A protein has these predicted regions:
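Amphipathic, hydrophobic secondary-structure cores in small proteins
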Residues: 10-64
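Negatively charged, low-complexity tracts enriched in Asp/Glu with abundant Ser/Thr
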Residues: 1-9
Length: 68
């Protein structure tokens, strides 16, 4: 899996919440308590949803200026 390089040394909690045919994936950066959520079809698979949640967390942390 291609984890964004800026997140490699950060502690991130990932949770999955299935809701019918959709799964909500939440990623939270432990140090800053920044949390993001995405949703996708159950058929996408856990790894795909995890990667997309990590990419979104990376984007949000960069936008806030927390990471570069």
């Amino acid at each position: 899996m291609n984890i964004p390089p800026s997140l490699k040394n950060r502690e991130v909690i990932i949770e999955f919440f299935p809701v019918g045919q959709i799964v909500k994936a939440t990623a939270m950066d432990v140090k800053t308590l920044t949390e993001v959520s995405i949703q996708g079809p159950k058929s996408a698979g856990e790894e795909t949803l995890k990667l997309n949640a990590l990419k979104r967390l990376d984007y949000v942390l960069k936008k806030k200026g927390i990471i570069t």
